Amino acid sequence: MYHGNAHRRFGRTHEHRKAMFANMCQALIKHEQIVTTLPKAKDLRPVVEKLVTLGKRGDLHARRQAIAQIKDVALVGKLFAVLGPRYKERHGGYTRVLKAGFRYGDNAPMAVIEFVDRDVDAKGKDSGPVFGADQDEAALAS
């Protein structure tokens, strides 16, 4: 029987699931909108909501709890400096999950999870390492 099991396992170990949600939280805080499968988006939502609530609290203990969860100090800074004040007057419901069709390869239901009053310019900003950028900067400087 499947009684008393609160969360989906996604075919992963506990550590793998925890790391996956930490990475997805980082991506959502950085870009303020991500595309993932519908079950992952539904399970990610309470994790992100708790992080935003920590950002609203704003004290040192909340900051340390957020760092323990997502492990990127720069994104924790954004969480406390941008997202916390943005949702100061809102009591929960910081994210929305929108259905986005089905994935081509395996017909998995896809979803978009985003912050409610998101910054449209944050999407795609600093979306990862740019290979060869060091040579371009050196060429421009000389």
Swiss-Prot record:
Pfam families: Ribosomal_L17. One of its GO terms (molecular function) is structural constituent of ribosome. GO terms for biological process: translation. Belongs to the bacterial ribosomal protein bL17 family. Part of the 50S ribosomal subunit. Contacts protein L32. NCBIfam families: L17. This is Large ribosomal subunit protein bL17.
